[in-house]
Amino acid sequence: MKNVGFIGWRGMVGSVLMQRMVEERDFDAIRPVFFSTSQLGQAAPSFGGTTGTLQDAFDLEALKALDIIVTCQGGDYTNEIYPKLRESGWQGYWIDAASSLRMKDDAIIILDPVNQDVITDGLNNGIRTFVGGNCTVSLMLMSLGGLFANDLVDWVSVA
């Protein structure tokens, strides 16, 4: 079972993610560890039946013990922690809702199912950083994904 850290799980994006993961029973397949930037030491949520205390989201040693980090904490957190963690030699998977890493060569924007092939290729080729896309663009591409996949779009114009 993978150790998966969650940072930013209380906000709008994170709370929707938690709800969806509970509904899909995703917590049954992982060991979740919940982190906080402001409430460390308090009781962690009990998603999936886990208990414990909130860990310090700035503790690099605690973060390095994780196989996967899922963060919805925002760009400032990502900009501070991500480079330090990678420079320390951490080889885990970083999954981020923030825009900070979108243009990095070693990151893939998650837009499943539109780019499932790109995600799969990235995983097979050692990519370990996955980021969310711009909400408006993502929704548009997801709604048009089937049309693109079936070569039914000649051109797109944006005003």
What is each model feature region?
Residues 1-159:
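N-terminal Rossmann-like NAD(P) cofactor-binding subdomain of oxidoreductases
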